[in-house]
Structure formats: C-alpha cells, structure tokens
Amino acid sequence: MGSVRTNRYSIVSSEEDGMKLATMAVANGFGNGKSKVHTRQQCRSRFVKKDGHCNVQFINVGEKGQRYLADIFTTCVDIRWRWMLVIFCLAFVLSWLFFGCVFWLIALLHGDLDTSKVSKACVSEVNSFTAAFLFSIETQTTIGYGFRCVTDECPIAVFMVVFQSIVGCIIDAFIIGAVMAKMAKPKKRNETLVFSHNAVIAMRDGKLCLMWRVGNLRKSHLVEAHVRAQLLKSRITSEGEYIPLDQIDINVGFDSGIDRIFLVSPITIVHEIDEDSPLYDLSKQDIDNADFEIVVILEGMVEATAMTTQCRSSYLANEILWGHRYEPVLFEEKHYYKVDYSRFHKTYEVPNTPLCSARDLAEKKYILSNANSFCYENEVALTSKEEEEDSENGVPESTSTDSPPGIDLHNQASVPLEPRPLRRESEI
C-alpha cells in the first residue's frame, strides 16, 4: 500500500559531451511549431544540482564589496563558519587594541608613563602600552582584577571607560545575534528531506502523469509543507528572441490545494499531463531526445524553530523513466504503519503504458489495453502482510501431500484452487 498522493535526491547522471544539432520551434520553442530553426547548441548544464544548490556564478558585479558591507549582518549569517570565527575574534581583539591605544595616549599626554612623577594618574597602574591593553580588556570584559582602575583626575578617561562599555555591549549583541541566527538557519534540515533518484511517467486514473517521490527522514513534521515545480528549457520566440532559460510552471494541484502535503511518510507528487502541461505533446521518444530540466521545490516551516526551509532538486530529461512506477514503501502492520526506505528510489516497469503523447492519448490515437493485470504494488503489500500473519500464527510451510480434513481424495479435483497472481520481478 503505497502512499496515496502524487510529488530529493538523486544520482547525478553523466552529461553528454560535445555539441549537437537541435531543432527548435519558432512558434513556442517546444517542438510543436511549424517553422523550424536549426541551431547548434551545447548540451544542457544542470541549473539546479541534485543536492539543491544552484549551478550559477555571478560575474562583473559592480560595487560588490560595498553592497555586501552595507548588509553586514546578512553577510555574516551567510558566510562560512571559519570566516565567522575570524570575524568574531577580530571584532574583540581590534576593539581591545583600539581602546588600549586610547588609554595609553591618555596616560602619555598626562605624563603617567613617567614613574618618577608623584601626581595622581588618570588610570592607576597604567605605565606602559601592555598595561593599557590589559586595562582595556578588563574594562570591556568586566574582569576587574583590581590593580588598574580609572580615577577622577581625567574626565576624558572616565568618558572612554563608559564609551568602551557601550561599544562592548554592541559588539556582543551583534556577534551573538549573528551566531544564533546562523545556528538557527534551517539549511541543514534539507539533509533529511529526500527526493527520488528518478521521476517517472505512467498512467494514473486513465491519464498520463509525471510523478516523483519526496520523503522526510525525521519524525519531526514539516509544517505547511507544499510543493512546486518548473520546467526549464531554452526557446525562441515568434519574434526571433532567444530565451536561454525559459521557466514554465508545472501544475501540481495549486488550484485544488493538493500541493499542500502532510509529509509524515513518503509521498508521490503527481503532475497530470493535460492540455495545459508543457509535456502534453511529448511522447516517450520525444522525452528521450528532449533537452529540458524539471526543478522541484519543497517548502515548509521547521517544527522546532518555525523558520521556513526550502529543499530543491531537479530532473533532466534522461532521468525521467517512461512507463515506470515507484515500489511501495508504506506497509500497514497490526498496530502501526511501517516505512521501508530501502524501496524509496526503486521503480518497476509497467508494460501497458502507452508510448504516445498525452495529446494523442486524449484524441484516441492510441488504444489502451483492457487487460486487468494485478498491480505489482498490491502484490508486494499483500505478500508482506500474508508473511507477517503466518509468522504471527506460527503456521509452518507444509510440504506434505495430505489432503485437508473433510475433503475426499477422489473428489479433490473438483475443489477450486485458490487463485494466486503471478509475481513479476521489479525491473529497475
């Protein structure tokens, strides 16, 4: 009993090398226009990697450093931890050095560095730069060993003590806030949200559907989880404009609300290939020769922090298996449901899947087989349940030819045998 709904993680397929001659439609750029333009283009590079990172590099950005410094807090949150640690240490060390220099200059101008002078010092026991640096550390960290202290001899020294205390509080608040914000980022939550290696196209409820599977490895829920998908493909407009990366939304039930999912067990997300789908005119052969990328997105709020997280992956055309379904992963036990993640990425072939496009199927150009074959998913689920019941009842497998009680051996041939469906192994 597989999951009832239809929507990360995949093996990165090898990219084709070299250049190829592609035929692009001028009308809409998806192979169903009348006018054809032959152009030589390079095989598509993955826009979104399988781990969710975008394969994009920014170049020639004007005033990049100034723009990043203007938003220093976000910059500190986004940088790596090693640089965050460097900024953390430098912020304190530089502030201690700055105020240490200030107190050393105050002592120098007041003549406190002259040990022969008997007048009252601005800061007692500060007669060198090292002593001034230690006094700066003691002031900002409120250590207060008791040997060095400011006096009322110099108002400027009193002001600098107050000013350093305020600056120290600001640095503490900024650094601690940035560290906490970085720790609370739900970025690592994506590691426990997985997409299937491949997407599949198969019949569901009499219609061709594009499907992919998503799962949550944690027991903590993803609140308000919902899915989105986009098809990325280059095309040429009717005016001759070349769009290298055209983004087309793929409907996964936004209008009906089924894009919002309850992600407790793995769920199969379904896109019905109808007349509004960008895959409506594509057959199996077209998919095999196509050059596009489907980006899938899962969004939701982390239950522990209530922060929004986004998990991404993508499927190239050669990662879409036509005529396959996912093996079931959800099984009903006696008092609970069991999820077997060893089957999460596995698929099996459905022989009766039409090879034509959804348009041809809707226009009755392809006759569906009426053969009522027992579904492999149900067979796996029922077999698992029967084996569990047999193990609980302690019924051993009998190899004896003894007949059951109450049945005559001469009339045994008239007793109908229990129909057992033939098991077909999964072809992955």
Curated annotation (Swiss-Prot):
- For this protein, the parts annotated as crossing the membrane are 82-106, 157-178
MF-aspect GO terms: identical protein binding; inward rectifier potassium channel activity; phosphatidylinositol-4,5-bisphosphate binding; voltage-gated potassium channel activity involved in cardiac muscle cell action potential repolarization
Per the record, ranges on the Cytoplasmic side are 1-81, 179-428
Q: Please name the SUPFAM superfamilies in this protein's record.
A: E set domains, Voltage-gated potassium channels
Q: Which family does it belong to?
A: Belongs to the inward rectifier-type potassium channel (TC 1.A.2.1) family. KCNJ2 subfamily.
What is the gene called? Kcnj2
**What subcellular locations does the record give?**
Cell membrane; Cell membrane, Sarcolemma, T-tubule
Q: What Pfam families does the annotation carry?
A: IRK (PF01007), IRK_C (PF17655), IRK_N (PF08466)
Residue positions of the PTM S-nitrosocysteine? C76
Motif Selectivity filter: residue span?
A: 142-147
Record protein name field? Inward rectifier potassium channel 2
Name the species this protein comes from: Mus musculus
Q: Which reaction does it catalyse?
A: K(+)(in) = K(+)(out)
